[in-house]
Amino acid sequence: MPSATPVIPSQQTAIVAEGAGQLSIYHDAPVPALQPDVALVKTAAVAINPVDAKMLDYSPVPGAIHGYDFAGTIVALGSDTPPHLKVGDRVAGFVHGMNPLLPDVGAFAEYVAASADLVLKLPDTMSFEEGASLGLGLFTAGLGLFQHLQIPLSLTREPSPEASSPTKADFVLVAGGSTATGTRALQLLKLAGLRPVATCSPAHFDLARRFGAEAVFDYHDPDCAAAIRAYTKNTLAYALDCLALAETTQLCYGALGRAGGRYVTLEPFREAIAAQRPHTVTPSWLLALTIFGRKVALDGEYGREANPEDREFGARLTEQVQGLLDEGKVDVHPVRVMGGGWQGVLEGVDLVRRQTVSGHKLVYAV
């Protein structure tokens, strides 16, 4: 007999922002309405990201549900959702948590209203806890590499053979290669047939190599940029900065080859550094939230108008990554599964705020 249609309540347990740095557990938060393009997901696990603490501290939205990364089971589908999805599918993705325009949507809740064309079906071999680590890092890396750096999106090419005289397009630098976004970027680049090189601390060299880095450099080394230039034979034309620090901007600019290229980071960059190579390096910074194709109602330079092109790109990226997941080609960033349920999630946001997490992602079964 077919399974019964899940009963969806009108209220749920969720973690809601109350003010700057303040979250509380509500047991009467509204379950988001089912929109035509939405997959409503019963949450099984959530992951903590640095942005969870950052946005809460600097751009809180009182009354809004927080959280970005989730995994769970589809319990309802809107009228305009991809035909390959069905109720009962195990999926993962990310949402714009603590969104002033959609305050009922956030990952830290029993039910998540996710953009259906941006969710990934999990293979049977991947747990919810592992799947919860995919979303934000994956889409941030993809947006940076294939939209901002303008590397062609093709995750089905065979890796290029080692060449004694690499072409301009061979090498891509990932600064912060051991971060969740960095490991995603390294893996996507390797699958795209490119030659990723990375910077991170020596303690995480093996992690970066595991995800595809051809060479890894210690970003603490004062000669790091020169070493990268030497390794890439002064041809490096692409740099993705996952740390978004003044020092890493300087490092990336120093590592790019003589002809210059493109630099993209995850935060506003230092104009003084960018001015050092104004005619040869094109800098930009990305906000992963544009991938939903909706207006991003944040203050100052973080606010963005709706960008339908990023939404279309996100759907294409999802489709290609889904194929890789189905083939077992996607490895997951190391996760540390924590206990405590929703209370544990509150504590996890504070752990990330205090920068005590390195080389793995905190994940909570809920």
From Swiss-Prot:
Q: Which UniProt keywords apply?
A: NADP, Nucleotide-binding, Oxidoreductase
Q: Under which main EC class is this enzyme filed?
A: oxidoreductase
Q: Which Gene3D superfamilies match?
A: Medium-chain alcohol dehydrogenases, catalytic domain, NAD(P)-binding Rossmann-like Domain
Which EC number(s) are documented for this chain? Answer: 1.-.-.-
SMART domains listed in its UniProt record: PKS_ER
Positions that bind NADP(+)? Y219
Database matches in InterPro entries: ADH-like_C (IPR013149), ADH-like_N (IPR013154), GroES-like_sf (IPR011032), NAD(P)-bd_dom_sf (IPR036291), PKS_ER (IPR020843), Trans-enoyl_RdTase-like (IPR047122)
Pathways per UniProt: Secondary metabolite biosynthesis
Q: What induces it?
A: Expression is positively regulated by the cluster-specific transcription factor caaR.
Q: Which PANTHER family match?
A: HYPOTHETICAL OXIDOREDUCTASE (EUROFUNG), TRANS-ENOYL REDUCTASE APDC
Family label: Belongs to the zinc-containing alcohol dehydrogenase family.
Q: What is the protein name for this chain?
A: Trans-enoyl reductase caaB
- Organism, per UniProt? Aspergillus niger (strain ATCC MYA-4892 / CBS 513.88 / FGSC A1513)
